[in-house]
């Protein structure tokens, strides 16, 4: 019996490997068919994540509408996509100048897209503006700019497209958010407030439009790092707060997030939280042991303020 088990083990492993390969290939093909011929709008397509989403959805045969602040950057992205695309399986992307912090033009741009295609099947709200500093040193003007870009811009774009989705009884809205929609981090008051606000809006919207078969999804990574950003090889220090902050800032790669956005669209997921164990634990502690969480975060602020500045 023991010899038979030993002989069967390689066959079992081979069978499992084969099934895993088939599943991965089927998932890849399913991902592409899920967006083929669909009109997909990506805001802030010039960011690292925006470019990767453009690459993934273009490969899947979507009719892309790429929105960005810089025309030269959009043309460069267009060239990069078309240079590797199969013309028989992909569509020519449409380029649109859009600054979500300029609310006066957002509605016009959204209407332009609808007039051009007649509908939008998938909207990926990706644009985000960040600011860091003590709350009392951040001007109200900057607070308003952050709210315009991260909250009012995305919801304005969404509200223009929503009636069309409801009347067609189909569509999906994906919000790429951030862990700071779950809890606040010191010196990021404006950014965290905008992320809390936009998460609240889309959580409410999800329930409102479910009866019309419109899907609302949120993808919240800890931090989308740049292509070159990696954690420094050094001693993290003994402080629990330092360890937490270092782990928190070591975020996920744009490629990972773009692939997760595609999976979210394909499976029509409602909420995805991308994080390593430490930030996930922080969310748990914030929810069930808030006083402990606040104490640890406050300790980190005091420790930072006690360190003398160089020079």
From Swiss-Prot:
Enzyme class label: oxidoreductase
Gene Ontology MF term list: all-trans-retinol dehydrogenase (NAD+) activity; oxidoreductase activity, acting on the CH-OH group of donors, NAD or NADP as acceptor
GO biological processes: D-glucose import; intracellular calcium ion homeostasis; regulation of release of sequestered calcium ion into cytosol by sarcoplasmic reticulum
Pfam short name (any one): adh_short
Entry keyword set: Membrane, NAD, NADP, Oxidoreductase, Sarcoplasmic reticulum, Signal
Catalytic residues in the record: 191 (proton acceptor)
Domain text: The N-terminus region encompasses a short hydrophobic sequence bound to the sarcoplasmic reticulum membrane, whereas the C-terminus catalytic domain faces the myoplasm.
Protein name as catalogued: Dehydrogenase/reductase SDR family member 7C
Organism: Rattus norvegicus
Name of the coding gene: Dhrs7c
